[in-house]
Amino acid sequence: MQPSRNFDDLKFSSIHRRILLWGSGGPFLDGYVLVMIGVALEQLTPALKLDADWIGLLGAGTLAGLFVGTSLFGYISDKVGRRKMFLIDIIAIGVISVATMFVSSPVELLVMRVLIGIVIGADYPIATSMITEFSSTRQRAFSISFIAAMWYVGATCADLVGYWLYDVEGGWRWMLGSAAIPCLLILIGRFELPESPRWLLRKGRVKECEEMMIKLFGEPVAFDEEQPQQTRFRDLFNRRHFPFVLFVAAIWTCQVIPMFAIYTFGPQIVGLLGLGVGKNAALGNVVISLFFMLGCIPPMLWLNTAGRRPLLIGSFAMMTLALAVLGLIPDMGIWLVVMAFAVYAFFSGGPGNLQWLYPNELFPTDIRASAVGVIMSLSRIGTIVSTWALPIFINNYGISNTMLMGAGISLFGLLISVAFAPETRGMSLAQTSNMTIRGQRMG
């Protein structure tokens, strides 16, 4: 039976919705787990006798785990398939979360944080590749933007659960173990999901892919063909692909480091709302997360109307302006601080969404998950450095100069975007993965 429709012509169906919902469970858990440790520290610090060094190690341990997980398991997913790893890593997150409830020393907690960082990091390249490869050209931007928003949903849920458990004796154990509940729900949802059709095709399992398409959509479905050559992990570092690795890692870093800087205004904003102390600080964090989550929503629509390149350039320009205002007017009133913070948070959604969308579009199926993993690992270097260096910089140079530094980094992101950001709107994965950094197509 000859295919009557192309995959990109299929309507958004129940299988697309299920893959999007359960696939975005990984970013949800990342936001949940990373934020929950901050809420739990109020009880953890006296319970395990943590000092400042241990608190710093716990944060660094999770980031180090993410670094390992993203870089290693993206490669493994490209080799063994999306679905198998899709299930294994979510089981591991749940098991480690439960095990964390029984730690009795800082060393044990550190080991658990490194391990959970590894398995959460593993899910990112797997899930984003799965969702991308199951999305049509029209759906792709919305789907990847949804992933970015789910991080903030997870962070918000963590603050709400932490608020609820704040007064419970030994509540920190339940806080850290509570991630097992969404893990179970996500595992149940993922269990019935199929393998990525594009991955099957690239592995020569054509008949299996055809049978799966008939089962899911009731008819054979055609795919735009990617270039037939075999792509290997080391090809990420060749002349064609490595410029894209550096480009996406750069815009990711230029978005993340200033975001950490502007978060220093968080206490002022939540203090204005009377939510800055003790238990209420968890509710204050919800406000901050909502600022950034709202910024992820407009790009879901604009990426397919305005396009990738204009949205990235415009967003970095507005983010630079907001940071510059905060740096150049040090004694501005609190409501102007809130306004500048809101402008930054709103426009950060553009780069925030594109740092997930671009690597999934610009690399072929054979190395897509590997590319996401390597790029995310490189971006984590910036995260680790900013986490360590930002408090020192603020202490030595003040908040105004810190904001100007952030504006400079954001400006660098703007210049890189003007020079190199490609436009992939309306193009199939076969077309986008065949581009060069100059916008030309190979073959």
UniProtKB/Swiss-Prot annotation:
Superkingdom of the organism of origin: Bacteria
Name this polypeptide is given: Putative metabolite transport protein YaaU
Record-annotated membrane-spanning stretches: 19-39, 54-74, 85-105, 114-134, 146-166, 174-194, 242-262, 283-303, 310-329, 335-357, 374-394, 402-422
Membrane topology (Cytoplasmic): 1-18, 75-84, 135-145, 195-241, 304-309, 358-373, 423-443
Keyword annotations from UniProtKB, A to Z: Cell inner membrane, Cell membrane, Membrane, Transmembrane, Transmembrane helix, Transport
Species classification: Bacteria, Pseudomonadati, Pseudomonadota, Gammaproteobacteria, Enterobacterales
Listed GO CC annotations: plasma membrane
Single GO MF annotation: transmembrane transporter activity
UniProt source species: Escherichia coli (strain K12)
Subcellular location: Cell inner membrane
Keyword Oxidoreductase tagged: no
PANTHER family associated with the record: METABOLITE TRANSPORT PROTEIN YAAU-RELATED, SYNAPTIC VESICLE GLYCOPROTEIN 2
Protein family: Belongs to the major facilitator superfamily. Sugar transporter (TC 2.A.1.1) family.
Gene3D superfamilies cross-referenced by the UniProt entry: MFS general substrate transporter like domains
Xref: Pfam families: Sugar_tr
